[in-house]
């Protein structure tokens, strides 16, 4: 079977969409399928082309058996709504034209970004092939939630296009049960929607001893390290975490480590300086292979989203990689994500944006050795049940049935 997959994020980018697509496609190739990925020159999240690549009109490479086609797009940093929209639209257009010349039995387009789904839908029409829409975020609803854009004619147009995509797709694959419920409420038949959650590559993310060399380099030996590793975006409300850190300075030898970048990174660096806090280290992102070293030195893996009803429907992918390395989780997200962490006893949850509850749960997690070991065991069970290989196989079965 020839699978054509459209995504605007792909390795060597290291964000969750790139990782999910790559690990799924790699498994499908191992199972004998022909997979072509149309993507762009790696540039996320800083909008700078990675070393060794150029933003050319068309270039090909083979990655673990996956045929990867990289096409030109207007590249900008992950900040500023208008520029990012132009970025997304340019990829939608060039990926469509590139896709016209690829053989395919089925087309998959992943959203966000939503304009990638529009390209998939249009290709399906012109090539007379079925298409699957993968929904990893409820876009454009999430734009309004984070305050990037208020209700206006553009949003209403995008919502209209969103419904057209849902109707035209032969199958919709979502990443949470809550998304399935939300789409059903929009009038999408339940039998059209399948759930394939995120997971962990258990060959890559396995328990390891703390990296002593890294601890020495960061001058964090003998510290209790609470770490946030991932995108520093509008949805993640990391200013709240910095304010919590400021209120806990000098307490219990706690130190907060931030690793990553995103639209809010510069604001967060300025806030750190304005608050004058010394118990926070903020670093730029590293490769997927190197990120294991940073996870290894954590005592607690921090996961946070702003307080919103929409975010009760999401499951941050950070849960799974941290669980794979058996790092107990402290999470400020309600809804389905909280149900997973608490049901597996993989960590503790605090009320989103509550400083008092954040401090209370953090103290509880790091002051009770029995609880801490229980959380490590819960992480182990969680990682076992969300094995990316198994999930990739389940998604491939859906693709075969859809074809």
Regions found by a protein language model. Give the residues of each.
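Carbohydrate-associated surface elements
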Residues: 178, 199
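N-terminal subdomain of nucleotide-sugar transferases
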Residues: 1-64
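A short, well-ordered alpha-helix in the C-terminal region of glycosyltransferases
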Residues: 357, 364, 371-385
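Acidic anion/phosphate-binding donor-loop and adjacent secondary structure
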Residues: 184, 190-192, 200-216, 237
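Nucleotide-sugar-dependent
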Residues: 236, 287-294, 299-323, 329-340
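A short helix/loop element that forms part of the nucleotide-sugar donor recognition site in Leloir-type
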Residues: 51-59, 206-219
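Nucleotide-activated donor-binding/catalytic signature segment of Leloir-type glycosyltransferases, i.e.
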Residues: 253, 259-260, 265-293
């Amino acid at each position: 079977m020839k699978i054509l997959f459209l995504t605007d994020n792909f390795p060597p980018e290291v964000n969750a969409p790139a990782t999910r697509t790559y690990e799924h496609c790699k498994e499908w190739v191992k199972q004998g399928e022909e997979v072509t990925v149309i993507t762009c020159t790696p540039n996320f999240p800083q909008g700078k082309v990675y070393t060794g690549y150029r933003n050319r009109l068309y270039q090909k490479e083979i990655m673990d058996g996956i045929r990867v086609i990289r096409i030109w797009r207007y590249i900008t940093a992950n900040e500023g709504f208008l520029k990012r929209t132009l970025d997304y639209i340019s990829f939608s257009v060039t990926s469509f034209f590139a896709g016209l010349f690829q053989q395919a039995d089925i087309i998959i387009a992943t959203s966000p970004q939503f304009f990638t789904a529009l390209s998939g839908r249009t290709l399906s029409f012109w090539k007379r092939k079925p298409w699957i829409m993968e929904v990893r975020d409820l876009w454009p609803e999430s734009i309004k939630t984070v305050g990037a854009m208020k209700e206006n004619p553009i949003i209403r147009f995008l919502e209209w296009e969103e419904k057209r995509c849902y109707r035209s797709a032969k199958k919709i694959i979502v990443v949470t049960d809550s998304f399935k419920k939300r789409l059903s409420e929009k009038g999408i038949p339940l039998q059209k929607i399948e759930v394939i959650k995120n997971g962990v590559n258990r060959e890559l993310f396995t328990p390891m001893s703390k990296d002593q060399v890294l601890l020495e380099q960061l001058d964090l030996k003998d510290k209790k390290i609470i770490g946030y590793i991932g995108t520093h975006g509008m949805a993640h409300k990391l200013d709240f975490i910095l304010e919590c850190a400021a209120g806990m300075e000098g307490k219990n030898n706690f130190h907060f480590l931030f690793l990553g970048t995103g639209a809010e990174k510069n604001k967060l660096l300025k806030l750190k300086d304005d608050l004058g806090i010394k118990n926070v280290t903020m670093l730029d992102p590293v490769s997927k292979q190197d990120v294991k070293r940073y996870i290894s030195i954590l005592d607690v893996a921090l996961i946070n989203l702003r307080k919103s009803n929409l975010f009760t429907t999401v499951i941050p992918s950070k849960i799974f990689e941290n669980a794979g390395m058996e790092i107990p989780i402290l999470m400020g997200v309600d809804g389905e994500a909280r149900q997973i962490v608490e049901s597996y006893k993989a960590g503790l949850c605090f009320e989103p944006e509550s400083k008092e509850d954040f401090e209370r749960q953090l103290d509880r997690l790091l002051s009770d050795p029995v609880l801490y070991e229980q959380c490590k065991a819960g992480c182990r069970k969680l990682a076992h049940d969300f094995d990316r290989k198994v999930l990739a196989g389940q998604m491939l079965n859906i693709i075969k049935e859809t074809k």
